[in-house]
Amino acid sequence: SEHSFPTRRSSDLVTFKQLKAIGWSAVDANFSATQLNSGRKTIIDSYLSELDISHDTPALNSAISDLSTTIDNSGAFSNALTLLAEQLNPTIQGGISKDDLKFVPGASIDDNLLSDIRLKIETQSGKSLEATEQSDGTKALITLAIYNLMNNGGMIAIDEPETHLHPSAQRNLIRSLKRTGRQLIIATHSGRIASEFDPDNIVATKAAAAARQPNEGLLQGKDEQKTLARWWINTRVELLTASHIIAVEGQTDRMLVERVAELTGRDLYRDGIEILEAGGCQEMVHIINLFGKNGFDIPLTVLIDQDAEAKLAKKLQITPDQLLDRNVHISRADLEDEYVAALGVDKLWNALSTSPTFKPNQITNFTKQFNHSVPDPSELATLCRDKDYKTHCAVLACSFLTPETASQITSVNEVLNEVFS
């Protein structure tokens, strides 16, 4: 089924009465950084003010009275007051004596039995510190925990809870909030936080663009795909706000797409275009499900090798000749074949055979397979796609590409032409 994210229109503004009815409470981005600053009323004071201490009032009053008496009878306090009076007496009209001064507990002045009560936390090192002395990250966790206890019904909205928090603390915070069973609305730039939610509970927003949210129930019952989706969102949250995604099989494909784009005058990242390494063709169908029409509905172009053509078509329940209609492009037979053809054997082979990456005996053994000193294009492509040398060969190839040769890598240019059309 479909669901949508509300747009901002004056007629849709929610009233204070409606917010109160649904139990709405909101935490802004600076909330946690200010609520435990020393020298001001803190969220701990607010939390304590909600306690019912009626049964403990007599004991607390007695303790405060005892403290006041102890201060009054203390020689140290008495001496301090004498010295202070001597300093003040010449400066204040009418004069000041020791009997005019008195040290008292804050609770007796404020008529508040809980005045100036502090929260202390023992650290892993065994040192006990006040909440106001903790790191900004720990302050944020304490603040949000207390806020959640004080607002334990309805919805809670939090703006950028990742502020000041270590990535692992971000994850732990969200898991703790989810365990409360409350409805959460969170604005975040953190992939670690976003990945804690199922994809259909995530709305991607971007200035001057419609909000994007997958169809309700997307990936329901598909735990393997959910795991992959959370991993992609965790590590590449910027994909959710991309203007276009180019999905490639692996690292070397990404390197070549970026280099060809650069040499042919197309700025991928300026225009919000992101490249996603799938980790193999078998994951392409999951990428299409997550980021395509039924998912976040982000313009998506896919590049795969020829040997994956039939497999992907079968998974998408279409014929291979229909792949282009789904924005899937094919490198024939693969990008190694294409960049060898574009660069020419002589230049690339000379660079590879003199590269320190290869030991002399490796080059010798390779050429012995073909009984000649210089391989033909097919043989050189075989070396370049070898898993032990694939990355290094791609790096060398990228370094030798020119605008002219880059324009001859057919499948990559087809992808870029589509993206920039």
Task: Walk through the language-model features, giving the residues of each.
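Coupling/switch segment of ABC-type P-loop NTPase heads
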Residues: 14-87, 340-358
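Activity-critical C-terminal alpha-helical subdomain
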Residues: 305-385
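Hydrophobic positions in the central parallel beta-sheet of the AAA+
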Residues: 25, 156-158, 246
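Switch/communication elements of ASCE P-loop NTPase nucleotide-binding domains
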Residues: 113, 119-238
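Extended helical coiled-coil dimerization/tether regions that scaffold
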Residues: 51-139, 146, 150, 155
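Short, small-residue-biased leader/transition segments that mark boundaries at the very start
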Residues: 3-10
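RecA-like P-loop NTPase motor core
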Residues: 179, 191-301
